[in-house]
Amino acid sequence: MRDIIDGFLRFQRDAYPARSQLFKSLATRQAPKALFIACSDSRVVPELLTQREPGELFVIRNAGNIVPGYGPQPGGVSASVEYAVAVLGVGDIVVCGHSDCGAMGAIASCACLDQLPAVAGWLHHAEAARAMNSAHEHASEAARLDALVRHNVIAQLANLRTHPCVARALEQGRLNLHGWVYDIESGRIDALDGASRRFVSLAEHPEVRAVGGEPGQAVA
């Protein structure tokens, strides 16, 4: 814990003064342009990946970058999505999976989660991804996991569309959905292209189209 406190002290001493005007402008309002939904994994840092400043991203993080489908008892993720879209008016939502995802690894390996009932219950929201992945052959366990990570991004994009605020914003043409997969070792990001319905290198195709139509029809 001491290193975390030391980090805060360095922030207060060095980083904050250098950006004091930015923080002053953010003291009473925020106007992020995008909602970024990522995994809780400590190796995935949305602001670092996108080189965004404070106030530019509205971020949701949880195990497996999961968005439960909208239901009669919406939870914290649903509330955060609704606030980002209906109140903050974000124009883009990114669902970002990543390599070596522990949540997806548990699904891919059919790990016993009897001792982790909350985790087991949470991962049921990725059942569609598991089903999609099981319908394909995989050359190795590593390939199975990589494909599952992509299928999960596709599944969570589909879940997003069940949220009334998202469906409404999409219909009105004021919201775009994006599916990304971040490779930790290489720094590469593959993005789901709305035109080809396949994942392509974001560095090689920065003009990649947002996801339209039915995300579930995409190819991992």
Curated annotation (Swiss-Prot):
Write down the SMART domains for this protein, in alphabetical order: Pro_CA
PROSITE patterns the UniProt entry points to: PROK_CO2_ANHYDRASE_1, PROK_CO2_ANHYDRASE_2
Query: What's in the keyword line of the UniProt record?
Result: Lyase, Metal-binding, Zinc
Catalysed conversion reaction: hydrogencarbonate + H(+) = CO2 + H2O
Report residues binding Zn(2+).
39, 41, 98, 101
Give EC number(s), comma-separated: 4.2.1.1
InterPro entries linked to this entry:
Beta_CA_cladeB, Carbonic_anhydrase, Carbonic_anhydrase_CS, Carbonic_anhydrase_sf
The protein's required cofactor(s) are namely:
Zn(2+)
Q: How is the cofactor bound?
A: Binds 1 zinc ion per subunit.
Q: Which PANTHER family match?
A: CARBONIC ANHYDRASE, CARBONIC ANHYDRASE 1
Q: What is this protein called?
A: Carbonic anhydrase
Species of the source: Pseudomonas aeruginosa (strain ATCC 15692 / DSM 22644 / CIP 104116 / JCM 14847 / LMG 12228 / 1C / PRS 101 / PAO1)
